[in-house]
Amino acid sequence: MKAPNMETITESLEKSMMNCSLNDRRRRVVGDGFGRSSSNEHMTPISDRTLELNSHLSLPCHWEQCLDLKTGEIYYINWKNGMRVKEDPRKVMNADPDSGDSYGTVCSEEDSSYYDSEESSSESSPSSRENHKEEEEEEEEEEEEEEDVLVVAGCKACFMYFMVPKLVEDCPKCAAQLLHFDRPHSASS
């Protein structure tokens, strides 16, 4: 039995990829189902479709826009109450503002604190806004670094070494206090 050459394999893969296109709603099996087809078969071109995502408009609080890859339909999920709808909550709210708060933008204090801080900083001068933003970003980066960095630590109780996050103080095996090798320790400890 002769092994197929590279050209045959490439052609077969290209035809298989055309058959599995996400844009083509009709699933076809060409030829024997392995991408091999008779010479008289030809592929129909895939039509171009445009889908407006309205990405320049922000969604109401707790809403997320999703795409169903099987059907190609866009739907929206409200993560606060689990509601899944096909209508764009931005359009529904603009059309009927008295429709209740099923699509509402009511945010908790926790959610709105972000917007409050943005509003108050926009009232100040641009340079102070930039400085404030830079300070916040630096603090967040330092906190993330502290949480993400793994260090070597040893346990005097169970005589084991561990790679643990920098902020972990207790042995994962026996819960005794760890000796971190990334920190200077006094001679008494």
From Swiss-Prot:
<dbReference type="GO" id="GO:0016787">
    <property type="term" value="F:hydrolase activity"/>
</dbReference>
<comment type="subunit">
    <text>Interacts with BHLH122/CFLAP1 and BHLH80/CFLAP2. Binds to HDG1.</text>
</comment>
<dbReference type="GO" id="GO:0004386">
    <property type="term" value="F:helicase activity"/>
</dbReference>
<dbReference type="InterPro" id="IPR051105">
    <property type="entry name" value="WWC/KIBRA_Hippo_Reg"/>
</dbReference>
<feature type="domain" description="WW">
    <location>
        <begin position="57"/>
        <end position="91"/>
    </location>
</feature>
<keyword id="KW-0067">ATP-binding</keyword>
<dbReference type="GO" id="GO:0005524">
    <property type="term" value="F:ATP binding"/>
</dbReference>
<dbReference type="GO" id="GO:0042335">
    <property type="term" value="P:cuticle development"/>
</dbReference>
<keyword id="KW-0547">Nucleotide-binding</keyword>
<dbReference type="InterPro" id="IPR036020">
    <property type="entry name" value="WW_dom_sf"/>
</dbReference>
<feature type="compositionally biased region" description="Acidic residues">
    <location>
        <begin position="108"/>
        <end position="121"/>
    </location>
</feature>
<feature type="compositionally biased region" description="Acidic residues">
    <location>
        <begin position="135"/>
        <end position="148"/>
    </location>
</feature>
<keyword id="KW-0378">Hydrolase</keyword>
<keyword id="KW-0347">Helicase</keyword>
<feature type="region of interest" description="Disordered">
    <location>
        <begin position="90"/>
        <end position="148"/>
    </location>
</feature>
<comment type="function">
    <text>Negatively regulates the cuticle development by interacting with the HD-ZIP IV transcription factor HDG1.</text>
</comment>
<protein>
    <recommendedName>
        <fullName>Protein CURLY FLAG LEAF 1</fullName>
    </recommendedName>
</protein>
<feature type="short sequence motif" description="EAR">
    <location>
        <begin position="50"/>
        <end position="55"/>
    </location>
</feature>
